[in-house]
């Protein structure tokens, strides 16, 4: 019996020596190479690491240094200086499910094509990592990333898994070509739904904070978004700048606040923008709203040749359309003020009270072509219920027939200036007068005009002007039918006979 006991003891000692020898060999470069080769040859993955380290002071942790891991024939999914694997008793029943995995000082590539990791963890921790998502819907590049994912159960094309809590911070991040720094994200993933409970970042010399949710169908719900002191320059036109909003099924905005921000593009700019938007849903090129509100003001707004100073806009949204409570701006040296409503069903813009004062406006060279060009689908008609003008200067520099009207005043009622997407004077009445005018180099004084329009005819009951020592007076009627039949009655007293030659 003593001999058998001694043999068992020797066998046990030999086994322990082999185990400890194997244990220490695994922590050498030779052991690391053999483990890496074994994994690469017996699986669809490639794995390399320099050293495997285990310390009795932390017996449940396994440390791998200078790790590269990925799918065979594809770029590496993970490159890390250190991978700390926390083991637990679960390895007895689920060897590939560990307690924690800490990735430190490396890069993690996330894309739809990324193969699933063959292991999972109760918690994935990132420390000073870089994240990239080449070829994915969200073009993401982040550096100095810290945080965690709980639990971490990666699947094909979903490195973060189907259901997890997320808390991440990044020193710098670029998402779809938009850079940001000091980024903080807290939220969760539930299959195809992403909940962002906290989003914060410094971007464009300002700050962004918000709460948002991405639904399974790809639509977004922004509960709260604040932009402060943004200074953003873009190389995109205004339509291209907002184009991403039309690529999602819908964007529901609960509350959007923009404070003291400036944005600039190739042919557009807005400075010192303050904006507050409530309860608006954008769906492709349309919108819906229940009790929505918009308040906006800025120091300057530029879009092409349009240049507005100190614009103020207050509006309310409803299923029926837009109630324009206030719009005022300084434009071309003067002031424009109006209020009214846009009706969704008829696509009609009805302005209750419009006032234009002190303008010094030169018509664009192609204003006649613009007058004939059909207007967008959303503007079927435009009606000025009440209109007034005061001390305006209007100039046309057309070399064939230049003209200028000085100190133009006027008023009108129920003027329909757009019908079936076409400019015109389709109904209503107006009276215009000025201190002086020049038509094709012929000076006149105190020109005045009174007209009344209906569905069939534009009647000019008074058209007069002083020239030289005489006066010109006329009446006219212009048919609204396509033939545009015109009748004119002209009287002149004390005017030269050749005064009309300059007018053709």
PLM segments and residue spans:
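Short, solvent-exposed loop/hinge segments that bridge or flank secondary-structure elements
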Residues: 132-145, 264-282, 396-417
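N-terminal glycine/threonine-rich, aromatic-flanked beta-hairpin/loop signature
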Residues: 143-168, 276-297, 411-431
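N-terminal Sec-pathway targeting helices
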Residues: 1-15
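Non-cytosolic head/periplasmic domains of membrane-anchored proteins
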Residues: 107-146
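Small-residue helix/turn framework positions
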Residues: 61, 66-68, 123-130, 160-203, ...
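Broad, structure-driven detector of short, well-ordered beta-strand segments within folded domains
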Residues: 85, 110, 140, 144-150, ...
């Amino acid at each position: 019996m003593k001999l058998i006991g001694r043999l068992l003891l020797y066998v046990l000692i030999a086994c322990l020596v082999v185990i400890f020898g194997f244990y220490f060999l695994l922590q050498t470069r030779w052991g690391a190479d053999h483990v890496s080769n074994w994994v690469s040859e017996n699986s669809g993955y490639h794995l390399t690491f320099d050293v495997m380290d285990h310390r009795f002071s932390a017996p449940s942790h396994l440390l791998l240094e200078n790790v590269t891991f990925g799918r065979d024939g594809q770029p590496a999914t993970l490159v890390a200086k250190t991978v700390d694997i926390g083991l637990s008793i679960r390895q007895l029943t689920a060897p590939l499910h560990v307690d924690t995995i800490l990735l430190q000082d490396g890069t993690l590539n996330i894309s739809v094509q990324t193969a699933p990791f063959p292991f999972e963890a109760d918690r994935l921790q990132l420390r000073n990592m870089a994240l990239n998502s080449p070829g994915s819907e969200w073009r993401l590049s982040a550096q100095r990333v810290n945080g965690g994912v709980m639990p971490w159960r990666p699947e094909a094309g979903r490195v973060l898994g189907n259901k997890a809590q997320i808390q991440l911070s990044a020193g710098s991040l670029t998402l779809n070509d938009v850079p940001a720094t000091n980024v903080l994200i807290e939220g969760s993933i539930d299959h195809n739904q992403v909940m962002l409970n906290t989003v914060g970042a410094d971007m464009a010399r300002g700050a962004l904070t918000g709460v948002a949710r991405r639904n399974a169908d790809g639509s977004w719900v922004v509960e709260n978004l604040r932009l402060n002191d943004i200074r953003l320059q873009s190389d995109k036109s205004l339509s291209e700048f907002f184009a991403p909003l039309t690529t999602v099924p819908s964007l529901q905005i609960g509350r959007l606040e923009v404070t003291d921000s400036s944005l600039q593009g190739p042919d557009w700019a807005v400075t010192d923008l303050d904006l507050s938007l409530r309860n608006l849903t954008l769906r492709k090129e349309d919108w819906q709203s229940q009790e929505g509100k918009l308040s906006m003001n800025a120091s300057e707004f530029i879009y092409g040749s349009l240049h507005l100073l100190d614009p103020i806009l207050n509006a309310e949204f409803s299923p029926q359309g837009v109630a324009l409570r206030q719009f005022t701006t300084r434009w071309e040296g003067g002031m424009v003020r109006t209020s009214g409503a846009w009706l969704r069903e008829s696509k009609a813009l009805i302005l209750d009270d419009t006032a234009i004062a002190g303008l010094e406006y030169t018509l664009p060279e192609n204003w006649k072509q613009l007058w004939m060009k059909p207007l967008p689908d959303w503007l079927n008609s435009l009606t000025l219920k009440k209109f007034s003008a005061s001390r305006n200067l209007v100039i046309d520099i057309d070399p064939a027939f230049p003209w200028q009207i000085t100190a133009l005043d006027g008023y009108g009622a129920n003027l329909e200036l757009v019908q079936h997407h076409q400019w015109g004077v389709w109904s209503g009445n107006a009276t215009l007068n000025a201190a002086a005018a020049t038509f094709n180099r012929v000076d006149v004084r105190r020109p005045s005009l009174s007209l009344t329009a209906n569905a069939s005819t534009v009647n000019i009951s008074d058209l007069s002007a002083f020239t030289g020592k005489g006066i010109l007076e006329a009446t006219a009627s212009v048919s609204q039918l396509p033939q545009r039949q015109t009748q004119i009655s002209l009287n002149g007293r004390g005017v030269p006979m050749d005064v009309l030659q300059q007018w053709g």
